[in-house]
Amino acid sequence: SYRILTEKIFGSNHPYGYNSTEQNIRSVGTPDILSHWQLNYQTTDSFIIVAGNVTNTILQKIEDNFGHIGLKKTPTRTDLKDIERDMRPIKSFKLEKTQSSVKIGIDCVSRQHDDFDGMFVFNTVLGGYFNSRLNNVIREAKGLTYNIFSTHDTYLYGGLFYISADTSQDQVIKMNTEIYTQIDKLLDKPIPKAELERVRGYLLGTLMTSFDGVYNCVETLRSCLIEGVDFASVQQLINKIATIETTEVMETGRRNLSIDNLIEVVIG
């Protein structure tokens, strides 16, 4: 369901929507892998991150082992924002299965966008953690699914916001209706203060782990570099979480989510 969702949102010819097939994989040979490595990894965009107790001896060993590798100029890349996307709504794909996997999504902002921090909070309230609205209402209170969450995937050129859930075939319509109801409520009604404070505490606590030890620090820096944002953006995100008010969460959601444009995929 995820593969179909990304294809329908971004388009089958878009790198974020392209899906490989068995035939594609079988046709790949060693020369193809080597060429891909040279064009996309062995370039001037490549970097090495070293953290911890780094001595001059360690730096010299890194230089001795990697400094001789010839890097090619990074090729001109197509700005993926300019690639035409296939946004034709596809409501469902039916297979003979007793269980159904549901994905409901829309293309969204990247980490470079001003709305990212607000969407980070919006997603958490809706379905980004165990005490989220989707989980509390649809899983815990109504028992319509055994697994539901929302997530905001971000890439260098854009992002993807989607809701994922699994349920029995006879509960799909009822569950999806409730999903849209919860989205509507979050877009239209202020978040209670206690709920927003709970989300703040959860997110700030979670982000602390991003700097817990050298390995987590390296991973945090790596993700910033790959997605085209400064390391200071993490502190900006923390500041936004600590100060954002319910009105801003609602307004950010309205700018980036439209129920009429959501694409729904049902497998099973």
Predicted feature residues:
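Generic alpha-helical structural context detector
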Residues: T6-E7, N123-G127, N136, S223
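His/Glu-based metal-binding/catalytic segments typifying zinc-dependent metallopeptidases
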Residues: T74-N131
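M16/MPP (pitrilysin/insulinase) zinc-metallopeptidase core fold and M16-derived inactive scaffolds
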Residues: V125-L144, Y155
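Charge-rich, well-structured scaffold segments of protease-associated domains
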Residues: S1-T74, S110, G118, E140-G268
